[in-house]
């Protein structure tokens, strides 16, 4: 059972743990590109507390409108500001964070879209509504990670451990997560 939530244009979700605000302003059903706006407050990070991760099936694009962000791709840091862009090729380990003293506002795109809008809307909604599923530092419970990453297979994996191992582990743990009460806010399309 999932909760009754849908993604509508203009939906805004705040993940206070990571100091990030998601604004779903782009096309919602475009199979080629998933696009949303993101605001990171000072000290804010994306990717779950600046957790290094990979997107095996999509390239990730960042276009900054205001402020500065740092994007670390395969250990190489780049700082980008207004009008500048960074591209993370699929499969490359990366994370991003606000690199300035003011909020950073930017657009994130995934090509192809896969179901990244649903993936991030789920995560942000859960972080906003179910804070007890997270540590005080904002780290999601491991069973929640297993459920989310199994539900949205081939969207995001942790950098480091072999992806095949993560797939097997998350497939085993996802039913346990459901038994413990963890749920998605939005069903995957399908």
Show where each model-derived region lies.
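Jelly-roll (double-stranded beta-helix
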Residues: 1-35, 44-58, 63, 68-190
């Amino acid at each position: 059972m999932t909760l009754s939530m849908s993604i509508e244009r203009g939906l805004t979700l705040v993940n206070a743990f990571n100091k990030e605000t998601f604004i779903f302003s782009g096309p919602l059903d475009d199979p080629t590109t998933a696009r949303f706006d993101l605001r990171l407050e000072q000290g804010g990070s994306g990717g779950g507390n600046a957790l290094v991760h990979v997107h095996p099936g999509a390239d990730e694009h960042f276009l900054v409108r205001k402020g500065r962000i740092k994007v670390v791709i395969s250990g190489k840091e780049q700082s980008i500001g207004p009008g500048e862009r960074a591209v993370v090729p699929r499969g490359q380990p990366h994370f991003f964070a606000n690199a300035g003293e003011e909020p950073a506002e930017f657009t994130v795109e995934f090509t192809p879209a896969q179901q990244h809008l649903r993936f991030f809307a789920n995560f942000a909604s859960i972080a906003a509504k179910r804070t007890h599923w997270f540590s005080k530092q904002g780290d999601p419970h491991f069973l929640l990670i297993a459920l989310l990453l199994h539900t949205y297979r081939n969207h995001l994996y942790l950098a480091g451990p072999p992806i095949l191992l993560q797939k097997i582990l998350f497939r085993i743990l996802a039913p346990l997560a459901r038994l413990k009460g963890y749920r998605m806010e939005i069903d995957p399309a399908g």
